[in-house]
Structure formats: C-alpha cells, structure tokens
C-alpha cells in the first residue's frame, strides 16, 4: 500500500487531524487537497450533469493547479515506478470481425447514457455503429436496428416532441420490422407521452403502450429481474434477465396486458 491523497479538507485543523490519524496507522500521506467548489461537477436528479451540457475546462484547470501545489508529485512518480506489473491473464482479446449489421445509436444531449463495454460488445459482434440525434436529425440513418440508451429526455421534451419527422421515421421503421431496443430514457421516448416535472405533457413516439410522468422524488432503486413472455431480440420465452432501476419517473400502461 503506497499511501493516500486526502481531499475535500475544510481547514488546517481538519488536515492536521487526518494527517495525525494516518501517521498513527503508518499510512503515508502523498497530498492534501482542500475543498473547492470550483472543482465540483454540477449535479441533477439522476446524478452528474452530462458533459455535453457543461464546459469542464475551468474545473479541470482548478484541479490541475491544486494537484501541482498540494500533492507530492515526485513521491507519487517514484511510487508508480515501484509498482509491480498487473497480471494480464484472463483479458479477452478483441479480433476484427466482418461487419454484419448497421446499428443506429441515439446520441445527443437527450440520450448519452451508454456503457462503453456495451457499444464495444456490439462492434465485437460485427455491428457497424452509426450515431444520430433524435433532437436534431429528421430521420433515422440507413441502419438495420436501433439502440436508444438512457439520458435526460425529460429535459428536452419540447424539442423531442416537436421533431415529428424523426418520430414518424421511428414508427415506420418499427412497422417494417426493424429491431428497436430502448432502455431508461430511451424507453420513455418510445411511450405515448411524457409529463415533465411541471405537469406539462408531450407526445412521444408511441411504440410502447404506456405514459410516463416525472416525479420530484426517487421512485425506483435496486436490482430487478424479468422473465420473457414472448420471443424477442433479447432472448426466448422463459429466459431471465437481470437489470437495475434508478428512476425519478413512473410508467403507466395504457393497454392490458402490458
């Protein structure tokens, strides 16, 4: 164990107290960074504000300057030199595969929550990824399937609802049998309508027979499981899926069964 870098320290006394505790434990302190509001990333109801909506230049510069002054960089570099090599066994190698399908990925200010591993897995399986914007583009790109990830569509409901040509393109693609996978905010976009925090309701794509409404408090959090009732692109009947919920919205089916 090489040591620690203290952060969010509020005062000289705070730093002295923590350093004393670390000394008693025999833990080297490589640096001590003071609390500074300029270093913080702005937050929203689901967590951090997406980088597409902010300019992090000032915060990064503040962090850089603080590290230069408050961290023993020479000791940190020497510590890095003494580190043992990490074992690479078990790491999967990615080999080039023939591109077998063109997959559209919704990516803009409203939809940006994607695990890089998910996109890499698609490419490793032979997908050619094509990014598009449900906010700005008039229609889907020339693709074989579409992936709508999460994001903050509730912050852009007016623009999403006004882009009727994109909605028409998605509905037409669905009618022609194109596979469409939507999760989180993407699923909200696929419903009939979404009501924002102020109670305003906006028509959406309408492929999912349900409506969504934003709430002021957290509605769902935790792990869930699902059982396939019909065969689909994710599995066969009775297959089980595991997932995670973290929602400030509620969904109400408009048809039964859902």
List PLM regions with ranges:
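Internal gly/pro-rich beta-alpha loop/helix module
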Residues: 1-95
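Residue-level signal for short, function-critical loop segments
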Residues: 8, 107-110, 211
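Short acidic, glycine/serine/threonine-rich loops at helix termini
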Residues: 13-19, 41-47, 116-118, 158, ...
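Hydrophobic residues at beta-strand termini and immediately following loops
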Residues: 33, 132, 208, 246
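C-terminal and late-domain segments of enzyme folds
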Residues: 70, 97-99, 111-123, 128, ...
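Phosphate-binding active sites in nucleotide-utilizing proteins
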Residues: 99-164, 168-175
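Cysteine-nucleophile active-site neighborhood
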Residues: 153-233
């Amino acid at each position: 164990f090489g040591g620690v870098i203290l952060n969010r320290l509020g005062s000289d006394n705070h730093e002295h107290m923590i350093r004393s505790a670390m000394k008693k434990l025999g833990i080297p302190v490589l640096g001590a960074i003071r609390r500074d509001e300029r270093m913080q990333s702005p937050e929203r109801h689901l967590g951090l504000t997406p980088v597409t909506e902010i300019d992090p230049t000032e915060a990064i510069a503040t962090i850089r300057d603080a590290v230069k002054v408050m961290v023993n960089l020479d000791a940190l570099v020497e510590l890095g030199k003494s580190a043992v090599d990490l074992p690479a066994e078990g790491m999967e190698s990615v080999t080039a595969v023939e591109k077998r399908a063109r997959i559209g990925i919704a990516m803009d200010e409203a939809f940006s929550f994607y695990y890089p591993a998910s996109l890499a897995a698609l490419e490793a399986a032979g997908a050619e990824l094509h990014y598009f914007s449900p906010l700005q583009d008039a229609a889907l790109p020339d693709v074989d399937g579409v992936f709508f990830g999460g994001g903050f569509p509730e912050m852009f409901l007016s623009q999403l609802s006004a882009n009727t040509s994109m909605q028409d393109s998605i509905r037409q693609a669905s009618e022609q049998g194109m596979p469409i996978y939507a999760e989180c905010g993407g699923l909200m976009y696929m419903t009939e309508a979404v009501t924002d925090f102020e109670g305003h309701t906006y028509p959406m794509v309408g492929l999912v027979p349900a409506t969504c409404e934003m709430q002021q408090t957290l509605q769902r959090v935790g792990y869930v499981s699902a059982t396939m009732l019909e065969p689909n692109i994710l599995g066969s009947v009775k297959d089980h899926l595991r997932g995670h919920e973290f929602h400030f919205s509620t969904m109400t089916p408009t048809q039964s069964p859902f």
